[in-house]
Amino acid sequence: MKSCYCPFRGERTSLKPCVSAWWAQKSGHSRDVYLSAVPNQNGGNSLFKSLKRSAKGANVPHAKATAGLATVKMPTPEHVIIPMSMHIGAPAEPVVKKGDTVMVGTMIGKAGGFVSANIYSSVSGTVQDVAPMRMVNGSMTTAVAIKTDGEQTIDPACVPPTVTDKPSLMAAVQNCGLVGVGGAGFPAHVKLAANTIDTLLINAAECEPYLTTDCREMLECSDTIISGIEAVMKYCEIPHCIIGIERNKPECIDLLCSLVRNMKGVEVKPLPMRYPQGAEKTLVETCTGREVPQVGPSGKPGLPADAGCVIMNVTSVSTLGKYLKTGIPLVSKRVTVEGDAIAKPQNIEVPIGTLYRDVIEACGGIKEGVELGKIIFGGPMMGGAAPSADYPVLKQNNGLLLFSKQAAVLPEPSACIRCGRCIEACPMGLEPVEVVSAFNSKDFDTLKARCVDLCVACGSCTYACPAKRPVSQTMTLAKAWYLGELRKGGK
């Protein structure tokens, strides 16, 4: 390994601790923080705690061209394919069979456990098949294929629920099939079950480039956002609510401020325009000044609940408000369709299970003379590339980006120069350059010391890398390998 004179140690040393020491001086922290991870009294570690305030994220382009466009409702497609796994946790269990008639809101999948979610038909029609399918991320699940009748008849069972206390609210949330629709897909009733919450955080940051679905939700459905917040605060006995909105949405900030002005315990907090402002731990710190510990009381990774907070996406809480009013569960999704290859960029509301290709067609198709180079589901920072347009829109999908072949060309990576920019960009205060090195040598102990399990896969490190290396992808692989080794029980 190459060496150099390190003024922080007063001797020749390898570049590895020297880079760590340089960053320690630059951020105002001691070098030792970067060379060990010592548990602290709060259940976290010195690495996470010391770096928390130096975490900065990345200044990514906003590209919110569709923010001013009203949502368009898509015509009912001829077919939908609805997977039983559209959430974190156990897949739902199909409760329909081939030939069954379904309506909008008919249950087709029952939650497979506490950490799971019910799934409902988004269309009226006939079940064509219940069969295995490969998801866009490569995993396998069971899916229900439905041929639509074009009527969109609503199931008579869809009636507004009666909510009088927390248990009945939890039942309503479960019956809604509600999950985090901002991207994670975590079942909402699991979050709200905690009894140690004093602050409800509404995540309206929408910090990903291109995506404007939450912006349109705030401008078009502010009444159901407020009713959803009121229900959660009342029945979960949460005294305080903060709605966090990035400052690049002034209309949304003004509108929500006017609506909550006379609501007790509710405030709107403008957030810095810095990606990833919507990340859970970043949002908790920015809005409340609290820390989410690395390790919670149970010994598992810390959650916002360990800091007295529960986070709901703004569209999720609005969906709850709509369900309490109408009894219609989560069956449709607003999607931002953008990119230089799509003919008519817009926000479009589609039935869950609609194939990407049908969404693309509803937005005018691919521009004439443009060769499609890449389809991204989600945003450009945390989304994934789809191998084709033959995949369905899920509950948590909020973007479909279409880029030309020219725009989709990846830059040629060069050798890492250990500049430390990935360290500066990481919102979790990690050292991606060291994690990558440890992963390449399959060094479990170093990955543990470098807290690889804190990585949120935000992509800031890759964005900041001047060598154009796939740092975030390697971080994700490193985290998966580390957690896999941890599950083996031998470490």
Language-model region placement:
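Cysteine-centered iron-sulfur cluster-binding motifs in ferredoxin-type domains/subunits
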Residues: 3-24, 33, 94-100, 410-430, ...
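Conserved hydrophobic positions within beta-strands
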Residues: 125-127
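N-terminal, Lys/Arg-enriched amphipathic/low-complexity engagement segments
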Residues: 43-95, 145
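Ferredoxin-type iron-sulfur electron-transfer modules in oxidoreductases and energy-metabolism complexes
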Residues: 397-413, 423, 427-463, 467-491
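Hydrophobic alpha-helical positions that pack around
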Residues: 239-356, 363-369
